[in-house]
Amino acid sequence: MIETNDSLRDCLAPAKLNLFLHITGRLPNGYHALQTVFQLLDWGDTLHFTRRDDGAITRGTDIVDVPADADLTVRAAKLLKEHTGTREGVNIEIDKRLPMGAGLGGGSSDAATTLLALNRLWKLNLPRAELQVLSVKLGADVPFFVFGKNAFAEGIGEELEQVQLPPRHFLVVTPRVHVPTSAIFSEKELTRDTKPLTIADFLAQHSCSAEWPDSFGRNDMQQVVAGKYAEVAQVLRWFDNIAPARMTGSGASVFAAFRSKDEAVAAHAKLPVGWSGAVTASLDTHPLFAFAA
C-alpha cells in the first residue's frame, strides 16, 4: 500500500471463505439467521483512492454490468460522506481480480476497504464500531471486513467474535457460473433449521487434520446450489480425488485447505484445461486494520 497526502494506492480488498455456513432459522425481519466462520485470504481486488477537492465521488474504472452508482465502493463513499458531512470527494479505481457471484465477498470487501481507506484519507478518525454499524447498510458481509479479523459470526453475519485460526494455504476453484444469493435463499429445499452451536464447539473440533473441512459442520447451501448448477457439482466431484472440499458462501467457488503452498500448487496443476483456480494463503488481519481504532 502506498500512501500520500492525497491518495492511497494498492489497497487490498481481501477475499473471504466461509469455513462452514449453517442456517439456523429466520429472524423477525425475514432475514435468515446464520452461523459461520469467516477466513480472510491474501487474495482480492486492489483499490486506489485519490482525493478530489470538488467533493465529487467518482469511479475511474469501467466494470461490466456494474454501473458506477450501483458499485458498492461508490455507495460506501457516498454513505460515509453523508454520515459525516465531510466536503471531501474521491476518485476510486478498482483492479478487479475476484469473480463476482462466487461467494468470496468481493463486492462487500471492496466496500469495507473503501470505508477504511476514506476514514484515513479524509481524516475522519471514526472508530471501528461506528464504521461497522454504518456498513450493515451496504450488505451482510461488509461488517466482517470492517471488523478486520477472522471471526465467528451470527445473526445475518454482523455479530462477530474474533477467532484464532491456524495458517493454511487454499486452492479456490471458481466455475464459470454466477450464483445469485437471493435466489438460493428462496429455494424451498434449503435447510433452515440447523441446530445452533457455540464458538467453543467450533474451536474444539476445528483442526489442521487431513479430514478438514469434512471434520466440522457443512455449508447448508451447498446441496441446493450443486443441484441447480451442474458446474458447481462438477468441481465438487473433481475435488473428491484431490482433497476434502466445500463451497464458500452461496457459491459458486469451492475450496480445499492444504498445510503447505507446495501441496496447494500441486493440486492446482491438476486442474482440467479451462478451469479457473487460485492458490492463496490465510490472513489473520485485514491490511487496512490500522485505519480505524
Swiss-Prot record:
Enzyme Commission code: 2.7.1.148
Record pathway: Isoprenoid biosynthesis; isopentenyl diphosphate biosynthesis via DXP pathway; isopentenyl diphosphate from 1-deoxy-D-xylulose 5-phosphate: step 3/6
Gene field: ispE
Residues where ATP binds: P99, M100, G101, A102, G103, L104, G105, G106, G107, S108, S109
Gene3D superfamilies (alphabetical): 3.30.230.10, GHMP kinase, C-terminal domain (3.30.70.890)
UniProt KW Metal-binding keyword: no
NCBIfam families found in the cross-reference section: ispE
Described function: Catalyzes the phosphorylation of the position 2 hydroxy group of 4-diphosphocytidyl-2C-methyl-D-erythritol.
InterPro entries registered for this protein in UniProt: GHMP_kinase_C_dom, GHMP_kinase_C_sf, GHMP_kinase_N_dom, IspE, Ribosomal_Su5_D2-typ_SF, Ribsml_uS5_D2-typ_fold_subgr
Keyword terms: ATP-binding, Isoprene biosynthesis, Kinase, Nucleotide-binding, Transferase
Protein name: 4-diphosphocytidyl-2-C-methyl-D-erythritol kinase
UniProt-listed GO biological process terms: isopentenyl diphosphate biosynthetic process, methylerythritol 4-phosphate pathway; terpenoid biosynthetic process
Record GO terms (molecular function): 4-(cytidine 5'-diphospho)-2-C-methyl-D-erythritol kinase activity; ATP binding
